[in-house]
Amino acid sequence: ACFFHKDPPRLAQGMAEKFINALPFASLWTNKAGQFTGLPEHAERLLEAERLLMVFPEGVHGTAKLFHERHSLVKFGTGFVRLALKTKTPIIPFGFVGAGEALPTVMNLYKLGRLVGMPYIPVTPYLLPLPLPATLRVHFGEPMHFEGTGTEDDSVIHEMVERVRLRIAAIMEETRKISAGEPQ
C-alpha cells in the first residue's frame, strides 16, 4: 500500500508462528514478506535495533476462532508486555477486523492438523480453507507506555496485558461500527 509513497513509513516486521517454517511454501512466502519466526530472541533483537514489530498477542489461538467467535478476543499471552518493558518499547494497540469474514471457519480439525505439522486445519462452509474476498480494516490506537523491567510479578504483568486487551477490544468495536456505518 505504501509502494508509491515518496517517504514510506517504517516497515513493521511480523512474527510468524513457529509451525509455519515446517510448511514447504509458507516459510518461503513469510521470509520474502519480511516475517520472522516467532521466537522471543528474534523479537528482542528487532526491538533493540529500533525496528517496528507487529505482534498478535492471541497467538495461534486467535486464528482458530470460529465464525461466531470472530469479534471476540481469546486470552492474550504475557510475553509481548514483558518484552516491551525489557526493551523500553511502547505498545501501539491495533484492531484488525474482517479476517473472520475472509475465512468463515465453522470447525477446526486439530488431530488432522497435528498430523501435517499444523496446530489445526480450518473447515469452512465450502470445505476448503481458502479466503473469500473481504474488506480487512486495521485501525491503530495511541501508544501505551508501561514502566518496569519485564521481571515483574505475573499479577502485575497480567494487569498490563488486560489494559492492552481492553484497548484493542475498544478499537475493534469502533472499527466495526465505522464499517457498519453506525454513529460513534
Positions of PLM-derived features:
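Catalytic core of membrane glycerolipid acyltransferases/transacylases, capturing the structured
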Residues: 1-49, 60-73
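Non-catalytic C-terminal accessory region of glycerolipid acyltransferases
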Residues: 45-184
